[in-house]
Amino acid sequence: MDFSIFRYLIVGAGFFGSVLAERIANDRDEPVLVIEKRDHIGGNCYSQVDPETEIEYHRYGTHIFHTSKQKVWEYINRFTSFNGYRHQVLASYQNRVYQMPINLETINSFFGLNLRPFEVGDFLKSEVEKENITNPKSLEDKAVSLVGRKLYEAFIKGYTIKQWQKDPRELPASIIQRLPVRKNYDENYYFDQWQGIPSSGYSEIFKKMLNHRKIEFHLKTDFFVIKPYIPKSCHVIYSCC
């Protein structure tokens, strides 16, 4: 491979690397080489079709696109359309189902109350004051100091143990700075104006981004193997973990 013809080398063909390559190729009209260690483009957003069911799925877990920036939304829609999906989450506790993140409906249903939006703040304050935690030492202390013991035990403790595989009392308080509590009935997980999942899948986005006469990309290529052959005149942009 002749690296001397490329002004830019981008390591990683995920969102950051692919967008940057597309921008350099179109805005600067300069040659870009994109390399990817995996056998596919798209990074952790890679999607593929299951041959048995013919259903497209996200190999590394579901990714929901969301933004409130019009410029970003207009840009990404050059490469795909979206299905309008808005993420909503439900949590089960003691055979009852509640909306998450915690909102006014969650609080009223859980405590059997009929609070109005302007009353939520004082109610949570009263729950927090029952524990009198002024200097949180652990994640558990911090969470209880934010939402009170009952909401913590019902909706945060179990999920935290599952996520970290540790008792929340053994985790530092610094892990969380705040817990989202909505003082209204908004049940959407994200606040952003534009949300959805690409109608043709994420992989199609990256194919279109990298389909440019100034862009060349190679899969199954390890940066550290080719590093000694890269000329100093080439700008290297490393976008991998």
PLM features: residue spans?
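Active-site/ligand-binding neighborhood in enzyme catalytic cores
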Residues: 96-98, 105-234
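Short hydrophobic core segments
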Residues: 9-11, 35, 232-241
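A short, basic/flexible loop-to-alpha-helix module at the beginning of a structural domain
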Residues: 1-4
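Conserved beta-strand segments of alpha/beta enzyme cores
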Residues: 31, 56, 81, 216-218
